[in-house]
């Protein structure tokens, strides 16, 4: 009688391709290297990444950390096969938060998880991450690619980002917000990266395919809704350096209604004139197709303003010039007032 043994198994037989992971690292190294900045001490491949705060120019730094994802916007990227800019979204969601604390983003790490690694698709995503980092002056110093068979449906993946920034001690924001301060809104580049569960429901109701012409843009519907989140880091840092900025609010989930109060002291609120900027066409279409009322738009989406600065009244003109010089479209949208809450006048349009 002959003993028989089953064929020997490998990790690849279980669905994990280490060679593909190594190929991805080799593919993305040039993109990551292009993000290097003062303070970076080593390239990709170590067990941890090193960063020298003194070499980055800091004397007495306070570190600020942020983490985020891009939500179900990923589903549109997956459904359309368009992975070129979703990485920019990932970076923006983190670094735009950091700058609201007054911090300069220093470095970034990403987490990419999927059931089966497609090197080409993953490389496009990470190259987008690197592009967002480079535009923000932030180094891509590491990350994790997790191939986990059975955890994700075929073709699905998830992303998370982690970023660390710094400011000198005593310069953290918000600081000094007072009654009479002015709100300056910076235009968004579309829906950005929140509210996409509602967006996808509206698209489903409309009956339009992702490759159909967008009713509100000169592109396909999928391309229009994948427009990446605007990176506000460099303009915001320029404004902070100019002086007079008391707070910044990144307008993400919760919209203007919930994000502005996060940077206000107890007892203060804001009066906002909704007619002081134009509602971008994408939001008009979403409102019409989804029968969304104004309150729903304002608490779900950015409604055309991706960042709001709270500034001294006497600094408005100078800061407006600084921000416009950095490429931003600036709108004076309201003031800080006594009494907690966000009070709207006028209407979106």
Curated annotation (Swiss-Prot):
One of its GO terms (molecular function) is phosphoribosylamine-glycine ligase activity. The gene is purM. Keywords: ATP-binding, Cytoplasm, Ligase, Nucleotide-binding, Purine biosynthesis. Pathway: Purine metabolism; IMP biosynthesis via de novo pathway; 5-amino-1-(5-phospho-D-ribosyl)imidazole from N(2)-formyl-N(1)-(5-phospho-D-ribosyl)glycinamide: step 2/2. GO terms for biological process: 'de novo' IMP biosynthetic process; adenine biosynthetic process. Its EC number is 6.3.3.1. It comes from Jannaschia sp. (strain CCS1). GO terms for cellular component: cytosol. The keyword ATP-binding applies. This is Phosphoribosylformylglycinamidine cyclo-ligase. Gene3D superfamilies: PurM-like C-terminal domain, PurM-like, N-terminal domain. It catalyses: 2-formamido-N(1)-(5-O-phospho-beta-D-ribosyl)acetamidine + ATP = 5-amino-1-(5-phospho-beta-D-ribosyl)imidazole + ADP + phosphate + H(+). It is found in: Cytoplasm. It is an enzyme of class 6 (ligase). The keyword Ribosomal protein does not apply. Belongs to the AIR synthase family. InterPro entries: PurM-like_C_dom, PurM-like_C_sf, PurM-like_N, PurM-like_N_sf, PurM_cligase.
């Amino acid at each position: 009688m002959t003993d028989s043994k089953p064929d020997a198994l490998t990790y690849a037989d279980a669905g994990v391709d280490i060679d593909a992971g190594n190929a991805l690292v080799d593919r993305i190294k040039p993109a990551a290297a292009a993000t290097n900045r003062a303070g970076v001490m080593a390239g990709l491949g170590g067990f941890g990444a090193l960063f020298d705060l003194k070499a980055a120019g800091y004397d007495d730094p306070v570190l600020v950390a942020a983490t985020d994802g891009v939500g179900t916007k990923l589903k549109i990227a997956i459904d359309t096969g368009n992975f070129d800019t979703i990485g920019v979204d990932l970076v923006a969601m983190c670094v735009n938060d950091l700058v609201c604390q007054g911090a300069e983003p220093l470095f970034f790490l990403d987490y990419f998880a999927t059931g089966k690694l497609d090197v080409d698709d993953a490389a496009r995503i990470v190259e987008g991450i690197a592009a967002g980092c480079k535009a923000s002056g932030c180094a891509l110093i590491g990350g994790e690619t997790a191939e986990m068979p059975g955890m994700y449906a075929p073709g699905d993946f998830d992303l998370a980002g982690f970023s660390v920034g710094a400011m000198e001690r005593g310069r953290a924001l918000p600081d000094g917000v007072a009654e009479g301060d002015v709100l300056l809104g910076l235009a968004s580049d579309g829906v950005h990266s929140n509210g996409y569960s509602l967006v996808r429901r509206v698209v489903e109701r409309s009956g339009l395919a992702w490759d159909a012409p967008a009713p509100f843009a000169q592109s396909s519907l999928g391309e229009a809704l994948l427009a990446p989140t605007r990176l506000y880091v460099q303009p915001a840092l320029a404004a902070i350096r100019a002086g007079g900025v008391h707070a910044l609010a990144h307008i993400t989930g919760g919209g203007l209604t919930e994000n502005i109060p996060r940077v206000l002291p107890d007892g203060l609120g804001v009066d906002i004139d909704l007619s002081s900027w134009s509602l971008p066409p994408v939001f008009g279409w979403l409102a019409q197709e989804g029968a969304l009322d104004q309150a729903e738009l304002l608490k779900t989406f950015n409604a055309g303003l991706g960042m709001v600065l709270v500034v001294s009244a006497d600094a408005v003109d100078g800061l407006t010039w600084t921000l416009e010089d950095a490429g931003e479209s600036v709108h004076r949208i309201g003031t800080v007032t006594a009494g907690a809450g966000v009070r709207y006048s006028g209407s979106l349009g």
